[in-house]
Structures are given as structure tokens and as C-alpha cells.
């Protein structure tokens, strides 16, 4: 079941869902708007192949900065953080979706990583890209996407209890940690 506005406010008030900082004005009928943080990470252009199993190739050629805005160039891919840190209990999951007004500028918010497991804690790393023919400026603090929350049965092994929870408690845009998986 998708949680609606009053259910979201109630679960936040009772501490079942934690969002920090929380702005009640961002609660929508079926979601909560999230804002763009100020940490951006991207790969410099190059010919070196990124091998997901090789940490060296995943972490080399990376540039990043903290900024009040970022000009996303046509075809550019950048990792960014959400301003909000969230914490989910073991019976609520979330998905992240882009805002339609941002999508109409050609900016995608996530490539495939839109699922947030029960038990997740931390900021959310956004996988942004610009498919527009022109650069698009995005600002730290602007509403950039929305979280949709779903109730589930209690997870037997929620994300915060997994020994291999690679992105638990992340607090900035985080590169892939796929290399920590077994080949």
C-alpha cells in the first residue's frame, strides 16, 4: 500500500520514518519531495574502461565538488546527494522518482537505482543525467524528486541488519561499490 499524506505525517511524527531535515510543506498527496544536496561527483572524460569488479577503475578519473549549483552538461552523468537523510523501518520501502518539471528540462534523477530497502539509513545518491541538448543548472536545496513510501510485511533481514549493506549511513554522493560483490 502506498502511504498518503496524513499517513506520512503520522509516521514521521511517531519516528517510524525519519527525514532530516524535514519540511512539512514538502509532503504531497502520495509522496514527499526531496531536495538536492550540494555534493556532486562525476567521471572525467577518458578512454579507461570502468570495470565494476575493479575498485581502482571505479574510483579513478573521478572529480567532485561541493557547490550551491551545478551546470549539468548535455550527455553528462553525475552522482549527487539528497539534502535529506532518511531512515526506514523494517516494514516500509521507498522508491525515488523525478519531478516532472525537472524531467521536462531533460534531467533524469536516477538511472535504475530507484529502490530504497526497508532498514535503509542515510542520504540518497542520485544518478543524474542531462538528455537535453543544452546545459541545465540545478541548485542545492531545490526540490528535485519525490519519495513514494510503501508498507510491506516486516523484512526478516532489513538493510540495516545486513553484513554487506554497502551504502548504509552514506552522507554524500557515493560511487559504486559493486566491486565488493563476489565475481
Curated annotation (Swiss-Prot):
UniProt keyword annotation of Protease present: no
Enzyme class: hydrolase
Residues at the active site: 127 (proton donor/acceptor)
Pfam families (alphabetical): DCD (PF22769)
Amino-acid positions noted as binding dCTP in the UniProt annotation, renumbered to this chain: 99-104, 117, 125-127, 146, 159, 166, 170
One annotated GO molecular function: dCTP deaminase activity
InterPro entries hit by this protein: dCTP_deaminase (IPR011962), dUTPase-like_sf (IPR036157), dUTPase_trimeric (IPR033704)
Pathway(s) per entry: Pyrimidine metabolism; dUMP biosynthesis; dUMP from dCTP: step 1/1
Substrates-to-products reaction catalysed: dCTP + 2 H2O = dUMP + NH4(+) + diphosphate
Site (Important for bifunctional activity): 114-115
The entry's keywords: Hydrolase, Nucleotide metabolism, Nucleotide-binding
Task performed by this protein: Bifunctional enzyme that catalyzes both the deamination of dCTP to dUTP and the hydrolysis of dUTP to dUMP without releasing the toxic dUTP intermediate.
NCBIfam families for this protein: dCTP_deam
HAMAP family (alphabetical): dCTP_deaminase (MF_00146)
Family: Belongs to the dCTP deaminase family.
Quaternary structure and partners: Homotrimer.
Protein name per Swiss-Prot or TrEMBL: dCTP deaminase, dUMP-forming
Native source species: Methanoregula boonei (strain DSM 21154 / JCM 14090 / 6A8)
Name of the coding gene: dcd
